[in-house]
Amino acid sequence: SNTFEIPDIQLLVQSIRNKSQRIGTEIIIVFDNTWAGPLYFRPLEHGMDIEIQAATKYVVGHSDAMLGLVACTEKTYKDVKNSCRYQGISAGPDTCYLGLRGLRTMALRMSSQFDNAMEVAHWLEKQDIIQEVLYPPLKSSSSYNNWRKSFTGGGSLMSIVLHKEYSDHELAKMLDHMELFAMGYSWGGF
């Protein structure tokens, strides 16, 4: 979400497991881990059943391949595998190559991106025009304590809340005159 709210992961998983027992039906927990990537949060280690992520972002790292990842528990593996097979979901060899290429530098890139994101977030917090920076690793974030309990780092994506509401014209003017940043697809890729 653009608000980057992180719940108490342990409480959420336990609540879902309790509900599953009460209703007598197994509830499968699926977690989109695109923001934190595979380095900063491991959903399966926190009791989730299936992890999905857009590998186009951090894994590939160059916005030059469309790739998604699914990791799952042994319990859900057969169903996930069959779903992918029956829907014809698979990646081509060149796309896999680009993903493997990106893995070589992913840790270095994500570490640098996290450090840079923290620096930018701290700078944004000091700007008069900004009411709030929505980035869980910030101590000022309402999600900070939950982030700190479960995550070991953070993604490079954040949002801001402005003090004033601006017109579409004013926002377009601001975006059109940016020199360091630009609007882009795939989290600012090409």
Give the predicted meaning of each segment:
Residues 132-190:
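Conserved C-terminal alpha-helix-loop-beta "cap" of PLP-dependent enzymes
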Residues 1-129, 134:
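Conserved PLP-enzyme active-site core in the AAT-like
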